[in-house]
Amino acid sequence: MKLIAEFNEDIAPIITESTNGKKDYFIEGVFMQADIKNRNGRVYPKEIMEKEVNRYNKEFVEKARAFGELGHPEGPTINLDKVSHLIQSLTLEGSNYVGKAKILSTPNGEIVKALINDGAKLGVSSRGLGSLEQKGNAQYVKGDFQLATAGDIVADPSAPEAFVEGIMEGVEWIMGTNGVLTAVQA
């Protein structure tokens, strides 16, 4: 399986103030898209995306375990020392999966809050593992797709796309019989 990542930049910050005067920060917008050829030349068939998002919602979102990181790491695992937000919802609207995430009070969450306060435009990039099949001029994500996170917070679409292409060409992730993912050179 290869590391697959996608970038979306239509994310809006939301700041709410609770009764105790504390501000809560959220990001909301399109996290992922199905049945559309994206900028990386990939298509996520809706039936594959829907099955995986349903699993992700049950196993991660509903259990408050759907973390995302600030930046885009090289592997499929979540690094708790880099977590910046917790995805609270991920729902299908047409071909779009709209997400909402609460910015946490972690060191990286505080960086995100400062960026929002200073007017930065942030994007999200999904991260998962799966196989790709070339069909015509697009690569189709196959049924073994596994979502690692519906969204890491990133700044610039060009850098994450170039970075992920490099990973996809050089590293494959193999699930061992012990359930541990291992990186191997492709």
For the regions a language model picked out, list residue spans one by one.
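Residue microenvironments linked to proteolytic maturation
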Residues: L3-I4, P13-E17, G21, F26, ...
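Acidic Ser/Thr/Pro-rich low-complexity disordered segments
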Residues: R42-V43, P73-K82
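Acidic/polar N-terminal loop/beta-strand segments that form early-domain functional surfaces
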Residues: M32, E69-P73
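Polar/acidic, low-complexity leader/linker segments enriched in S/T/G and N/D
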Residues: M1-K63
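Short, charged/polar surface micro-motifs in flexible loops or helix N-caps
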Residues: I36, G75, S105-P107
